[in-house]
């Protein structure tokens, strides 16, 4: 049987404060059964993507604050949960610049897999590609989770929503690399004749895998996570991605999600998808194109 999905439309037919989608977020959460997800006194992980340096279209802080306030009203102890891309200090600085902090959101922002993405628990998935997933410790130990996902396009899975937010965003760096390697077995290919020696590729790498030698990129294949950020940062096609195997990527993501969700009771997870600012690229990208469809609204479900 299909799960019920509740929708809060983006269009406001009457210009009244009470009709604002921000104001109506608590009603949406109530309709989907948030009171069954939040247990008084228990921590509640509010999982969301904090964006990248240069991006600008993540979920707006005022929406997140409404979710936080609702959890508090129900007696829960909310915290914003995200995993390392750069190290925790750099990522929290990016989050603060974008308006995600204790003052604006009303709860702590926690990098749940530790300073360098090494704090995790191994969980079996039963999958074929990702047999074991490294679930971030802060997710593993949380009794409840509310998944706030910004719906976008994606270069490998075509669509990015709750599955990508959980499968990639709730796991430690080692599992992120494993999933990326499922589609990109080899590191980016470098064409020296096209290189303008601008250095933008090195700035885009969050993993220290790309260094400049005489202003030309040199990739360490051991450190490279195959995220392909450097290829998107290169405007001269000097760094290009190898031919991808996208079916493997989507399967690996799904297997990772299965492992993450196995650490929760099924009734203790709620999914909220923001179908607004739907860009062709996901929020990991260092810059984002204009939205490809008009804003639709916010979807909420227990599945």
Regions found by a protein language model. Name each.
Residues 2-48, 53-63, 69-303:
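Extended, low-polarity segments enriched in aliphatic/aromatic residues
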């Amino acid at each position: 049987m299909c799960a019920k999905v509740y929708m809060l439309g983006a269009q406001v037919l009457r210009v009244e404060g009470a009709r604002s989608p921000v104001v109506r977020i608590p009603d949406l959460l109530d309709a989907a059964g948030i009171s069954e997800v939040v247990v008084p006194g228990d921590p509640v992980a509010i999982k969301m993507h904090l964006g990248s340096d240069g991006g600008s279209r993540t979920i707006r802080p005022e929406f997140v604050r409404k979710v936080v306030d609702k959890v508090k009203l129900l007696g829960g102890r909310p915290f914003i949960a995200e995993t390392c891309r750069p190290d925790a200090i750099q990522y929290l600085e990016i989050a603060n610049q974008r308006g995600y902090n204790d003052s604006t959101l009303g709860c702590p922002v926690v990098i749940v897999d530790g300073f360098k993405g090494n704090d995790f628990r191994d969980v079996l998935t039963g999958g074929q590609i990702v047999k074991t997933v490294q679930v971030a410790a802060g997710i593993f130990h949380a009794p409840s989770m509310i998944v706030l996902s910004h719906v976008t396009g994606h270069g490998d899975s075509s669509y990015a929503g709750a599955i990508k937010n959980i499968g990639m965003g709730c796991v430690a760096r080692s599992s992120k690399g494993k999933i990326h390697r499922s589609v990109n077995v080899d590191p980016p290919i470098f064409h020296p004749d096209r290189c303008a020696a601008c250095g933008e590729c090195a700035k885009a790498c969050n993993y220290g895998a790309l260094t400049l030698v005489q202003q030309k990129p040199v990739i360490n294949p051991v450190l490279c996570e195959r995220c392909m950020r450097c290829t998107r940062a290169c405007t001269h096609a000097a760094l290009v991605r190898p031919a991808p195997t996208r079916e493997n990527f989507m399967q690996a993501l799904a297997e990772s999600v299965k492992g993450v969700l196995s650490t929760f009771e099924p009734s203790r997870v709620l999914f909220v998808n923001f179908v607004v600012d739907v860009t062709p690229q996901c929020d990991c990208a260092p810059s984002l194109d204009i939205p490809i469809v008009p804003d639709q609204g916010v979807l909420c479900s227990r599945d």
